Amino acid sequence: MTAKEKTASGYVPLPTEQRYSVGLFFQDYVPRFPKYRFSLKAIWSDGLPMAAPRKGRAEGYFRTPPYRRVDIGLSRRLAGGEDRIMQKPFFRSFKSIWIGLDVFNLLDFANVNSYYWVTDIYYNQNAVPNYLTGRQFNLRLSFEF
């Protein structure tokens, strides 16, 4: 699906035109170790069209670089089901307790979020990219009621 606007000089993409976006999510557990769970998430999307603030889209536009990201995670069930610890008074209200480690943006892609526009003395506008965060680690503790 494309979102284009017809102008005198031809077709110009609208600011929301993203030509493709592909996402993948995979989650599984290790058969010999059912308390462990692994997840993989990948996203690859086309860049959005941008134009300088003082110029119209018809005068000139460009696309941001593609958005790419890969996340992985590993979780372990600490308690749940028939585990002995679940018989203690504090844990009786929980179905299960999980601890997990995630790595966001595993491949450390430098994705562009937006642009800061710098105007020179000749009124030319230059786009300076603002990048999203790089690789991050996340430790989580999850309680299911």
Identify what each model region corresponds to.
Residues 22-24, 36-40, 72, 97-101, ...:
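Transmembrane beta-strands of outer-membrane beta-barrel proteins
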Residues 1-51:
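Gram-negative outer-membrane beta-barrel transporters
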Residues 16-22, 66-70, 95, 133-137:
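Residues that define the transmembrane beta-barrel architecture of outer-membrane proteins
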Residues 43-53, 76-145:
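C-terminal beta-signal and adjacent terminal beta-strands/loops
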Residues 7-13, 57-62, 124-129:
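Extracellular loop and loop/strand-boundary signature of outer-membrane beta-barrel proteins
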Residues 21-23, 51, 62-67, 123-128:
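Glycine-rich loops and low-complexity Gly/Arg-rich segments
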Residues 15, 27-29, 61-63, 90, ...:
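Residues embedded in well-ordered secondary-structure elements
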Residues 29-75, 84:
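Extracytoplasmic gating/loop element in the C-terminal half of outer-membrane beta-barrel translocons
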